[in-house]
């Protein structure tokens, strides 16, 4: 068995469909967006889109249509999934709670039938008499719409026209009538049929039109008064209604294929059209009024409005605003203007919605050396191509920033006694102090009476009896608030300089070298109570009051130089309660007593970024439970702040971190800032609930996210990225990309638009000694699109394209790796290519090119001709492992800097994927699943260990551990194969057993080992082993991790219980949705826990939680089973959410 947990780290972002209507109420205008398995419901308001609800469907949404049957006050939603579940949904709201009610449901899959190549089509008769589905060739499926039917039942009508391209119901027909484009050996034709519900048959339709354009691909049914249909082709747009026929062939639409359309006006006089290049057109139907008052179509006109993201779907909302749903780039809200701008465009983007899809490749890197992976993806395609940098952390939203270098500390003040909010910020520098007045959002420098400005401040704040305090290197100064004047000052008796200080509302402790002085704050008086001498100099101290001690701290925490110790002293006597030797050479720089979730802690940060934390007993001053984490490489300063009414600690360093507690465990979360030296909380009128943060050069005021989430940065390339790798020595990424160029009259090609490879700082072009013939142009015609492939070298800090290297004509770059080879000290970028010609079934030649990038130059070090396409390449024990068409080949790197073949393995159809671990190689084949090879270094050859004999068409593979291998295949499933080392016969040993099966519902393009969260920080009790991330076509990022058997069984039990409690939208069974499903077989899911379902436990109500845990047996780590409580499971699930 294999025990795995699969969970979503980023939900799918690519938009597959969108509709608009009145779903939430008759008055609301709604936009509904489908992102694969997720349905998002928005209300269209004057301010933009307001999200109402997000629904996770147990299925890939294939069809989504709003309709309003007679007698309904608002629209209902029809959904069909890829596994042929159908449902009719209704929106119900009572108070705050929103429900999506399933009015009717069913499954319309046929036992036999060939799924149509042109995909699933679902249409609804305008009079809401029936739903029509085209799922299989030669069949038209009808679901009659009766109001009372809870179960949706369908019947098939045979369709002689096997190859239907598109079909729609016509408007204004007595009987439901379909109009469709179909193809036969003679070409493409348009035909209509009436659908008879009684006979369950087709009757002859009102009209037909033979031999329309050969590329006719879309039918648009036109409402009355015109009626009829518009047929859209590659070059022409035609209108038919039986007695009228109109055709136009505007040259403007010829450049690209129209892929989506949407009606603007209810009467069908205007339509939006979107094409593959992201151009947006308006199709206008001009009317002519006849003498008898009827309206006929006079003319068709097409106008280019401008450019948008490449649209998968369009929907017109209101007031000239259009939603552009994109699968290949970010989706947009655009405004259509009456007048064009300077570029001649009528389209203005108002808002963009991030889309990571399609994720074609990705790599995990720790760029800032922060012990936390960032994911860099190759996302999008064509002009929407980009790199996306994704990291998990707590975001800071900047509201103001001031250039102020050299800040050594900062504190908020309420200078006016009658204020609830801060109005002043005090900044400390070496040898001086400056005061900033906050007036609304304005910030100006000012002076405070009673404060000194020519010394460095160690502490400043509001204290008891309406007073302010300023502790500088020279003295402790007490200042009255009203009027502002110095009322008391304390200096060290020999006038020595204060080195560190800590203060709360009524107590002060200062250190002068080894001496400690304890003062109390009284009205207009600082009273020295006691002092003591330590054996070493004091490096840091803290007297934060904990518990309910009336704001007084009975304890003082100090860190000492020389013996590197942390100590807890009793006030006022300075009696030593506890001494903790921290060990090592590095001095403590910051110490803090704090309370998280009513447990008291002592935190002590050293000068090298290490942080010790202990449990603190405030009665006895004893420390317990010592733990250590590393939070950076530089001295760390600890400050508390409050967020969501809980205490948090901000650790300022070169790797700023927020420390908080969850389930009585400390959690350390990255803050998405490069560096923070000092911070303080700030709550002023202009900047409520904010933080002030200082680095070496700048003061920033901002607000902080309440939760950790994924932050996405976009680097547009304007061309298609294919592969990415990271090279640490040159601090660069290598990216393979392709741009589209068009053949011109001279036989050359021209780029369609500027993009990353045409705008690089420097560039070079391949010239190969290997293929003399390849440079002779193959047959291409004028206006034909060709792909031009490049290797881009991209700076890891600025993401600037430093160099672009263009490959040969017709040469496709397929694989990329950065590695060292043999004993050669250099690190190389190595690219595998193929010469691709349309007349060849598969590539017959390609090359492996070895590049070195150093000092801003890219040099070709070696090239090797191969007889085929170099699909994947990986570094393998100092050698280069590549697969060329069906052969897996190992090259060694000679001292002459040449690649020499060492050994081959031939037993594949097309070896598309390679992963290695030690001497083992996992090969993923186009159609023959996975195979495990072992390299024998003594013999210098490959041995076939075992293979999976199931015919899986692979899309990605990964090695989980020595015995478990993860695969993704093209029917959206995941599986795990296991090597059976204990098998007794050779035959059994050669079989990889499928021990894990799961329907993911996503097409996985890439797996890679790595994590999006901080590694090894804090404590965790969830025994998850390893972390493999995956990226999909829909822009989803997921994670697979391995579990122990006992945890797997607990979560499986929990999953089954959750399925009884959580009602699925559309009444689709979870077990049906997750069952492994291909055209060959369907098997129940096994070996995988659905993490998304487990995490939904946190969102359900308390009574439902109780229902889930009833009689659930749980081992709390003591080895004994007991009945679980809801809180036990909340803890378990919260821990699991922290892995992504």
Swiss-Prot record:
Pfam families: Beta-prop_RSE1_1st, Beta-prop_RSE1_2nd, CPSF_A
Keywords, alphabetical: Acetylation, Biological rhythms, Cytoplasm, DNA damage, DNA repair, DNA-binding, Isopeptide bond, Nucleus, Phosphoprotein, Repeat, Ubl conjugation, Ubl conjugation pathway
Crosslinked residue numbers (Glycyl lysine isopeptide (Lys-Gly) (interchain with G-Cter in SUMO2)): 1121
Mod. after translation: Phosphorylated by ABL1. Ubiquitinated by CUL4A. Subsequently degraded by ubiquitin-dependent proteolysis.
Post-translational modification N-acetylserine, affected residues: 2
WD repeat beta-propeller B as annotated region, ranges: 391-708
Superkingdom of this protein's organism: Eukaryota
Subunit description: Component of the UV-DDB complex which includes DDB1 and DDB2; the heterodimer dimerizes to give rise to a heterotetramer when bound to damaged DNA. The UV-DDB complex interacts with monoubiquitinated histone H2A and binds to XPC via the DDB2 subunit. Component of numerous DCX (DDB1-CUL4-X-box) E3 ubiquitin-protein ligase complexes which consist of a core of DDB1, CUL4A or CUL4B and RBX1. DDB1 may recruit specific substrate targeting subunits to the DCX complex.
Positions bearing N6-acetyllysine: 1067
Region (Interaction with CDT1 and CUL4A): 771-1140
Stretches for region WD repeat beta-propeller C: 709-1043
Region (WD repeat beta-propeller A): 13-356
Name of this protein: DNA damage-binding protein 1
Modified positions (Phosphothreonine) in chain numbering: 1125
UniProt-recorded Gene Ontology molecular function terms: DNA binding
Annotated Gene Ontology cellular component terms: Cul4-RING E3 ubiquitin ligase complex; Cul4A-RING E3 ubiquitin ligase complex; Cul4B-RING E3 ubiquitin ligase complex; cytoplasm; nucleus
Family (UniProt): Belongs to the DDB1 family.
Domain comment in the entry: The core of the protein consists of three WD40 beta-propeller domains.
Annotated source species: Pongo abelii (Sumatran orangutan)
Subcellular compartments: Cytoplasm; Nucleus
Gene name of this polypeptide: DDB1
GO biological process: one example: rhythmic process
InterPro entries: Beta-prop_RSE1/DDB1/CPSF1_1st, Cleavage/polyA-sp_fac_asu_C, Quinoprotein_ADH-like_sf, RSE1/DDB1/CFT1/CPSF1, WD40/YVTN_repeat-like_dom_sf
UniProt main location, coarse: cytoplasm
Pathway: Protein modification; protein ubiquitination
Region feature (Interaction with CDT1): 2-768
């Amino acid at each position: 068995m294999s025990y795995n947990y699969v969970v979503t780290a980023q939900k799918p972002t690519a938009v597959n469909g969108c509709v608009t209507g009145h779903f939430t109420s008759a008055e609301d205008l709604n936009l509904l967006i489908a992102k694969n398995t997720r349905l998002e419901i928005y209300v269209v308001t004057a301010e933009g889109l307001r999200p109402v609800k997000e629904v996770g469907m147990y299925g890939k949404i294939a069809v989504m249509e709003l309709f309003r049957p007679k007698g309904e006050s608002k629209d209902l939603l029809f959904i069909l999934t890829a596994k042929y579940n159908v449902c009719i949904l209704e929106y119900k709201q009572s108070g705050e709670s929103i429900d999506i009610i399933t009015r009717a449901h069913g499954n319309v899959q046929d036992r036999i039938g060939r799924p149509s190549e042109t995909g699933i089509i679902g249409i609804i008769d305008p009079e809401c008499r029936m739903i029509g589905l085209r799922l299989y060739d030669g069949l038209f499926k009808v679901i009659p719409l009766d109001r009372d039917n809870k179960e949706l039942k369908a019947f098939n009508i045979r369709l002689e026209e096997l190859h239907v391209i598109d079909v729609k119901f016509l408007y204004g027909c007595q009987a439901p009538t379909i109009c469709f484009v179909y193809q036969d050996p003679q070409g493409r034709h348009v035909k209509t049929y009436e659908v008879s519900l009684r006979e369950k048959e087709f009757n002859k339709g009102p009209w037909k039109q033979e031999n329309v354009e050969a590329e006719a691909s879309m039918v648009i049914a036109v409402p009355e008064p015109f009626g009829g249909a518009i047929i859209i082709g590659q070059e022409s747009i035609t209108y038919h209604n039986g007695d009228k026929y109109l055709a136009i062939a505007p040259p403007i639409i010829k450049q690209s294929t129209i892929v989506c359309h949407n009606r603007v006006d209810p009467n069908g006089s205007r339509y939006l059209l979107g094409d593959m290049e992201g151009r947006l057109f308006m199709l206008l139907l001009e009317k002519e009024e006849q003498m008898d008052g009827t309206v006929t179509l006079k003319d068709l006109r097409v106008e280019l409005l401008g450019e948008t993201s490449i649209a998968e779907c369009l929907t017109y909302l209101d007031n000239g605003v259009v939603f552009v749903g994109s699968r290949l780039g970010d989706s947009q809200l655009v405004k259509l203007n009456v007048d064009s701008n300077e570029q001649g465009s009528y389209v203005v983007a108002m808002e963009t919605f991030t889309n990571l899809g399609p994720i074609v490749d990705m790599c995990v890197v720790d760029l800032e050396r922060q012990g936390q992976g960032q994911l860099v993806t190759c996302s999008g395609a064509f002009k929407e191509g980009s790199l996306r940098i994704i990291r998990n952390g707590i975001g800071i939203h900047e509201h103001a920033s001031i250039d102020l270098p050299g800040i050594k500390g900062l504190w908020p003040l309420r200078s006016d006694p009658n204020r609830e909010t801060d109005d002043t910020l005090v900044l400390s520098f070496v040898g001086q102090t400056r005061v900033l007045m906050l007036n609304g959002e304005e910030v100006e420098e000012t002076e405070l009476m009673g404060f000194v400005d020519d010394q460095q401040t160690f502490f400043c704040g509001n204290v008891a009896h309406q007073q302010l305090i300023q502790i500088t290197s020279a003295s402790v100064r007490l200042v009255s608030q009203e009027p502002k004047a110095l009322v008391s000052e304390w200096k060290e008796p020999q006038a020595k300089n204060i080195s560190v200080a800590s203060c709360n509302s009524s107590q002060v402790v200062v250190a002068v070298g080894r001496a400690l002085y304890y003062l109390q704050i009284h009205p207009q008086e600082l009273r020295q109570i006691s002092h003591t001498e330590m054996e070493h100099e004091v490096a840091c101290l803290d007297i934060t009051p904990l518990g309910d001690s009336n704001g007084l701290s009975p304890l003082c925490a100090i860190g000492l130089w020389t013996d590197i110790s942390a100590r807890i002293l009793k006030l006022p006597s300075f009696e030593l309660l506890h001494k903790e030797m921290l060990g090592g050479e590095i001095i403590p720089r910051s110490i803090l007593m704090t309370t998280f979730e009513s447990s008291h802690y002592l935190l002590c940060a050293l000068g090298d970024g290490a942080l010790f934390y202990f449990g603190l007993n405030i009665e006895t001053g004893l420390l317990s439970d010592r733990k250590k984490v590393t939070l950076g490489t530089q001295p760390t300063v600890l400050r508390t702040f409050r967020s969501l009414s809980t205490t948090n600690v901000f650790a300022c360093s070169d790797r700023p971190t927020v420390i908080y507690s969850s389930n009585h465990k400390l959690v350390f979360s990255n803050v998405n800032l490069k560096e923070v030296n000092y911070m303080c909380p700030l709550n002023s009128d202009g900047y409520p609930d904010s933080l002030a943060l200082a680095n070496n050069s700048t003061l920033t005021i901002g607000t902080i996210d309440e939760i950790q989430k994924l932050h996405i940065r976009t680097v547009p390339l304007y061309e298609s990225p294919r592969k990415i790798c990271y090279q640490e020595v040159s601090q660069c990424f290598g990216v393979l990309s392709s741009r589209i160029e068009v053949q011109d009259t001279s036989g050359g090609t021209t780029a369609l638009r500027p993009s990353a490879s045409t705008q690089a700082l420097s560039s070079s072009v391949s010239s190969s000694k290997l293929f003399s013939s390849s440079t002779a142009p193959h047959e291409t015609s004028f206006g034909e699109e060709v792909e031009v492939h490049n290797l881009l070298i991209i700076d890891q800090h600025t993401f600037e394209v430093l160099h672009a290297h263009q490959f040969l004509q017709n040469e496709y770059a397929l694989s990329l790796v950065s590695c060292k080879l043999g004993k050669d000290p250099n690190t190389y970028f190595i690219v595998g290519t193929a010469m691709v010609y349309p007349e060849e079934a598969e590539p017959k030649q390609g090359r492996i090119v070895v590049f070195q990038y150093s000092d801003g130059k890219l040099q070709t070090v070696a090239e090797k001709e191969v007889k085929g396409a170099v699909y994947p390449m990986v570094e393998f024990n100092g050698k280069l492992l590549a697969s060329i068409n069906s052969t897996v080949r190992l090259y060694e790197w000679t001292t002459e800097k040449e690649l020499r073949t060492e050994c081959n393995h031939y037993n594949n159809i097309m070896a598309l994927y390679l992963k290695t671990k030690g001497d083992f190689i996992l090969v993923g084949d186009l159609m023959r699943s996975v195979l495990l090879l072992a390299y024998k270094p003594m013999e210098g050859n490959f041995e076939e260990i075992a293979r999976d004999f199931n015919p899986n068409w692979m899309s990605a593979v990964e090695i989980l551990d020595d015995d478990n291998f993860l695969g993704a295949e093209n029917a959206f499933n995941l599986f795990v194969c296991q090597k059976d080392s204990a098998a007794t016969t050779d035959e059994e040993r050669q079989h990889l057993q499928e021990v894990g099966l799961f329907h993911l519902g996503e097409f996985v393009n890439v797996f890679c080992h790595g994590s999006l969260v901080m590694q090894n920080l804090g404590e965790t009790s969830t025994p998850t082993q390893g972390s493999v991330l995956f990226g999909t076509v829909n822009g989803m990022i997921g994670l697979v991790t391995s579990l122990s058997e006992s945890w797997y069984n607990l979560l499986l039990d929990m999953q089954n219980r959750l399925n009884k409690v959580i009602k699925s939208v559309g009444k689709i069974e979870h077990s049906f949705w997750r069952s492994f499903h291909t055209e060959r077989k369907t098997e129940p899911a096994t070996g995988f826990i659905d993490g998304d379902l487990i995490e939904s436990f946190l969102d359900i109500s308390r009574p439902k939680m109780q229902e889930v845990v009833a009689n659930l047996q749980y081992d709390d780590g003591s080895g004994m089973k007991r009945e679980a409580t809801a809180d036990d499971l909340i803890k378990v699930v919260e821990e699991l959410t922290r892995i992504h």
